[in-house]
Amino acid sequence: MAAPQGGYPPQEGYGQPAAYGSPTQQQAPTPVQHGGKKKRAYAGEAFEFGSGANAALGGQLPAGGSYGAYPQQQAGYQQPAAYGADPAQAYAAPAAPGVAQMTQQFGAMGMTDPHLLPPQPAPQAPQAPRTVPLNQLYPTDLLSQPFNVAELDYPPPPIVLPPGTSVYPSPYANCPPKYVRSTLNAVPTTHSLLKKSKLPFALVIQPYAALHDSEDPIPVIPDQVISRCRRCRSYINPFVTFLDHGHRWRCNMCNLTNDVPQAFDWDTALQKPADRSLRPDLNHSVVEFVAPQEYMVRPPQPLVYLFLIDVSYASVTNGLLATSARCIKESLDRIPNADRRTRLGFIAVDSSLHYFSIPRDGSENSNPQMLVVSDLDEPFLPIPGDLLVTLSECRENIESFLDKLQEMFQNTQNNGCAMGSALRAGYKLIAPVGGKMTVLSSSLPNVGHGALTMREDKKVLGTSKESSLLQTANSFYKSFAVECSKAQVSVDMFLFSSQYQDVASLSNLPRYTGGQTYFYPGWNAARGEDAIKFAREFSDYLSSEIGLEAVLRVRATTGLRMNTFYGNFFNRSSDLCAFPAFPRDQAYVVEVAIDETITRPVVCLQTAVLHTTCNGERRIRVLTLALPTTQNLADVYASADQQAIATYFSHKAVERALGSGLEPAREALQSKIVELLATYRKELAGGSVSGGGLQFPANLRGLPVLFLAMIKNLGLRKSAQIPTDMRSAALCLLSTLPLPLLMQYIYPKMYSLHDMPDVAGLPDEKTGEIVLPPPVNLSSERVVPYGLYLIDDGQTQFLWVGRDAVPQLVLDVFGLPDKSQLRVGKQNLPDLDNDFNQRVRAVVEKSRDHRSKGVGSIVVPHLYVVKEDGEPGLRLWAQTMFVEDRADQSVSLVQWMGSLREKV
């Protein structure tokens, strides 16, 4: 890989080859104004330098020598004299030196992107000679060159390997960052150097980048010839070396020489010799092997879904029972069933357990039978034979059962919910085969096993005692989860209560079984937006090609050891993570220890996931990452990945919050960022305080902002207003979201819509992907009173309508003559016959597009319309997204940087 270009930030982030991906989201290039017909811009000074919110378009000069030396803001934001006075220019043309001219000037300087500006700070001299220079360190001052949100879209610092590291020169030889990211892309050779750096060494692993294989295909090796090292059991990969005329290979992890299997160079399909240099496992770092018999303890299990549906009064009245029954029925074709072995079962739960035996299609009696069990202490299985039925054999009867299920309980007055007992009963039913228990509930489990009580106390919120509410109230939920894990049973929770439901306790079941907690506070099917959101998400959930009976292990070069694992699974032994089901919408963090001095120029870390596909095939997904080593602290800092580091500390903060409390978690985050800044200043900035600044390398400039945003996140922030269930659900997200979604959840995306560039909201000519406007920093200083903004944290979207928004804007976007008629709250945007409405809708939809971020997710965020001068509660909620502002018991970004400067 070529050495990175000088100057920060160089083109494409850090001079990284295209194979490793520049920012996934297509950012809008700046429009060049021509004399022809002009697109509408709804702003007063749409592109005026320093005004408006379009930071990345020029209001804010990002990273570069003079980052963020903002020109003075205009005094107030004058509204244009007359909107649409000139019919040719429907909404006031942009004034002043349009960014267009600047773009042309920068273009002449070879800098087509306005956020890649001159002059560069001088790179630091490396301390030790290398065959290939690693990334250079670019010092910057965080105070005089403020953070620009566009920096969060840069790819990680490139992984610079010596030439000839891989056995064949394949562009796919090293693992792409969407699957595995290391916090350090240059690894210290000793434990003492790592300790001196104060940086963490960890991997962020996301083995799947989509819910379905077809959306993210990787090479599959079907010949069942799997070559592994005899000693360390690593899989053959692009970084091994061949010896003895290719008859033996040396392991790149432990150096042992192994024999090449006889069938390695034989094409079983064509029955003739094959070209070894074309084998996927020697060219691709991400591959999947079809596993032979010896990788199975038992025949591959079928896909099993057991639905535990709350049918108590709360669940019938809010429409959950009817909506989930209808949604399962409509999704039967989407549930993976290629091998025709998929099985389904249903248990309805109130103060009793209701089992359903569903006959095969074409039987004499096609009516489902309901069997009620009221003994909750030892729930027995009535007739286990046909309680779990094969989908393809009972399809019609399953449909008619789901139609009837809604009616069976429509007049119930039963407020009991024996979900703990139902889980025990469900476990007995599916433990022999393993599978998924999907819980759909609107109530607190209040009778039977694992009964819980209302323990939330408003007086405790915001105090040190609040932490006890985030811990499990009943040991059943942890001990039962471990039992489930051993029997290959996974639990997913869909929770819908409008009252306290104890998410803190219930979320333990998914946490230890490879499941997930999905939380829908105050959900009601009578609101169309609620019903549609859940139906879309639940249908995608059922269609997801999950893995079954899976284990994950990470192996590495001698001298490295996997130390701690974070994520939703059960840690079965020191280095083995067990997943009864392997989801496709989660990421995992593994901390790596350096136990002995590393003498090699390159280390490798290999993740392997052994699993059964939902089509009954045993497979191993292998992801191999090679990283250069260094004895030089400057190299370690210059190659550190700020987003991977933030992900690691997000998991650490959740662990600390659940173990010690929220205040210790927040304090730990603050003291960590202070420690990193102080270490950098002392070791690499020569201890000098140049003009009272705050020095940090260019590639880590976002870290102080991300740490502040974490401290302000719903899961961790200091507040007496946050319901415990909301907080617990947020902690679940902070410890499971894939990296791109976690970054957005911590530091949401904000787009200025009223003055978006001409190309935004339209398909890109080359890729066909909708172009998003440039993101804007999350500060109210960036928001103009006549503006329209989209704020999106990946879970919720807000459409912010400024108090002085002009009538034409309201008419074009919402189809209403006057802002006073605009209803606030949850809604879908109307589909109107005008260009601007279509572009706004396209941006809202594209912002939800998980696939373009390289992740699998079922979440469809709600869209809330917020008026700046409208309903105060909603406005305050939206304003919590402005993480750079001062808020309830928390500091602004400027104050935060000032306090960091004092502490350093």
Curated annotation (Swiss-Prot):
Binding sites annotated in the UniProt record for Zn(2+): 229, 232, 251, 254
Alphabetical UniProt keywords: Cytoplasm, Cytoplasmic vesicle, Endoplasmic reticulum, ER-Golgi transport, Golgi apparatus, Membrane, Metal-binding, Protein transport, Transport, Zinc
Signal peptide: none
Protein name: Protein transport protein sec24
Entry keyword annotation includes Metal-binding: yes
Gene3D superfamilies per record: beta-sandwich domain of Sec23/24, Sec23/Sec24 helical domain, Severin, von Willebrand factor, type A domain, Zn-finger domain of Sec23/24
GO function term, MF aspect, one: SNARE binding
Assembly and binders: The COPII coat is composed of at least 5 proteins: the sec23/24 complex, the sec13/31 complex, and the protein sar1. Golgi apparatus membrane; Peripheral membrane protein; Cytoplasmic side.
Protein task: Component of the coat protein complex II (COPII) which promotes the formation of transport vesicles from the endoplasmic reticulum (ER). The coat has two main functions, the physical deformation of the endoplasmic reticulum membrane into vesicles and the selection of cargo molecules.
Topology class, membrane: Peripheral membrane protein
Matches recorded under InterPro entries: ADF-H/Gelsolin-like_dom_sf, Gelsolin-like_dom, Gelsolin-like_dom_sf, Sec23/24_helical_dom, Sec23/24_helical_dom_sf, Sec23/24_trunk_dom, Sec23_24_beta_S, SEC23_SEC24_subfamily
Protein encoded by which gene: sec24
Chain positions covered by the region annotation Zinc finger-like: 229-254
Region (Disordered): 1-39
Family: Belongs to the SEC23/SEC24 family. SEC24 subfamily.
